[in-house]
Curated annotation (Swiss-Prot):
The keyword Isomerase does not apply. It comes from Methanocaldococcus jannaschii (strain ATCC 43067 / DSM 2661 / JAL-1 / JCM 10045 / NBRC 100440). GO terms for molecular function: structural constituent of ribosome. The lineage of its organism: Archaea, Methanobacteriati, Methanobacteriota, Methanomada group, Methanococci. InterPro entries: Nucleotide-bd_a/b_plait_sf, Ribosomal_eS24, Ribosomal_eS24_CS, Ribosomal_uL23/eL15/eS24_sf. Keywords: Ribonucleoprotein, Ribosomal protein. It holds the Pfam family Ribosomal_S24e. HAMAP family: Ribosomal_eS24 (MF_00545). This is Small ribosomal subunit protein eS24. One of its GO terms (biological process) is translation. Belongs to the eukaryotic ribosomal protein eS24 family.
Amino acid sequence: MEIKILSERYNPLLKRKEYRFIVDHDGPTPTFKDVKLKLAAILNANKDLLIVEKIVEEAGMQRARGYAKLYDNEEMLKLVEREHILRKNKIEEETAAEEGE
């Protein structure tokens, strides 16, 4: 899986950076967890402040487009983001559940 950043924009009102990216991959569309971890590594960012909002597969290609947001602090993240997006982006709970099995 390879991620290429298409655009980066800082939103001063919401105190976050907004990224549009392309994911080139083999096989099925990568999970939010996989994309979030890879994107956090590329951006050298705290994975807890990074939100991957959407990943949309391009028809007939091994490529997907995505949109992610990197917040300056956790307070702003919790104030702005919707609950279902936060649940979709939780990695700690998911990892703990997998280890407990």
